Amino acid sequence: MKTIIDNFVDRVIEYGMYNEIDKIYVKNRVLALIGEEGIDRISDENDLKQIKDYLVEIALKNGKIKDLIEEKECLGAELMNFIVPLPSRLNDIFWSSYDISPQEAVEEFYKLSKDSDYIKTSAIAKNIEFRASTKYGELEITINLSKPEKDPKTIAAEKLVKATNYPKCLLCMENEGYQGRINYPARSNHRIIRLKLGDEVWGFQYSPYSYFNEHAIFLNSQHVPMAITSKTFEQLLEIVDILPGYFAGSNSDLPISGGSILSHNHYQGGKHIFPMEKAKFESEFCFKDFEDVNAGIVKWPMSVIRLQSENKNRLLDLATKILNKWREYSDLEVDIIAMTEDVPHHTVTPIARKVDGRYELDIVLRDNHTTEQYPDGVFHPHQDVQHIKKENIGLIEVMGLAILPPRLKPELEEVGKYLLGEDNAIADYHLEWADQLKEKYPRINKEEVNSVVQHEAGQVFARVLEDAGVYKNTPSGHEAFMRFVKSVGIN
């Protein structure tokens, strides 16, 4: 049996960053972080992340850190950093491995990101995930419980922290190895693979709070704002060439229709087949001068033009033509407005894939204009569905995966109690919906109530996506969609 610190040191050496001769050195470096009291505790624990948690507890007892989530996270990341190579070494390892097997290189990087606790697998496991059958196929729902909520002590401590603009944002290269602070996440164990996209240097990393398998982030090495251009399509198609089996997509570059970070140009990707990818063509056509590109409208709640070709350059040229036309296209009959004075409203959410040597590009048309009736956005979740989802509909939601707020875990449980006629604390904003469900399921029982509520939450998410779709799934909506397609030019 070994002491907990010796156990930790042995596990660190197993990862190959240090040799047997480094044992004393590593132990002393760990002691500098956690203190020297309580280190004789015997442990046969083999899980490195669990041992790390024990060492953080020792550091807390020794007064090396305060009892704040952020300080524990910072120390935890510092301890796990012992198993992660320096950025230069890791990039050498990755690209050397890539030359032999791209798939193996990616798998090794993903494994390291999990093993080092950069990807918060334990926290992610807390999420509630389910699927819901809709007329658009099965949609995926996640109630996001993974990110720790701030406690009162942390909120109080934040007020005492001086403002700083370093790192500039959560997506900057400056985060690599950053210790973290009270109001900023720990990144000591964070590493970024450098890659060239065209003439630009970009970074490839994983999301610490993944929403799907191998949830990757690709970030510009420079702190430049989101911008959907021809270069966006080019870079997304390049990513799917570099990383076999990955999709790559971008949030749009305008508020309301975009993601939460517009200040730093980035894409997302991963190894996951989203519901939208499974959706079939509703109608197919041929764009003029692009007879070699298969094209059509996808049967989906949002407005999607899908392009398919083995020729990447042809796909790029057609996508650019569609984007340029959409930027200036208005159709007042269906409330589609490209510009208000000098303010642009039109952009796209693009998603690239490569399947069996064939490139596929989904172009989701977006419009962010507002009216008095819809101050949050004409093509944003409307008031009657905001009890489930009121946040922006970004890339992940567009593809059919709802990321719902933590409040919905207890709130949906209360909706279930309401349907059963039990004592409950149902939120006022769920009442109208719950009454509709009561009417729809008059004889609901305890065994089925949870699955019924989840299924119906999925139907609301489908409506959320319909609200965000610029062309509605009606005969007049389809007719209007085809007016735009014809304006681009079809045979």
From Swiss-Prot:
Pathway connected to this protein: Carbohydrate metabolism; galactose metabolism
Keywords assigned: Carbohydrate metabolism, Cytoplasm, Galactose metabolism, Nucleotidyltransferase, Transferase
A matching Pfam family: GalP_UDP_transf
Keyword Cytoplasm applies: yes
Enzyme Commission no: 2.7.7.12
Catalysed reactions, semicolon-separated: alpha-D-galactose 1-phosphate + UDP-alpha-D-glucose = alpha-D-glucose 1-phosphate + UDP-alpha-D-galactose
Membership in a protein family: Belongs to the galactose-1-phosphate uridylyltransferase type 2 family.
Protein name: Galactose-1-phosphate uridylyltransferase 1
Organism: Streptococcus pneumoniae serotype 4 (strain ATCC BAA-334 / TIGR4)
Gene: galT1
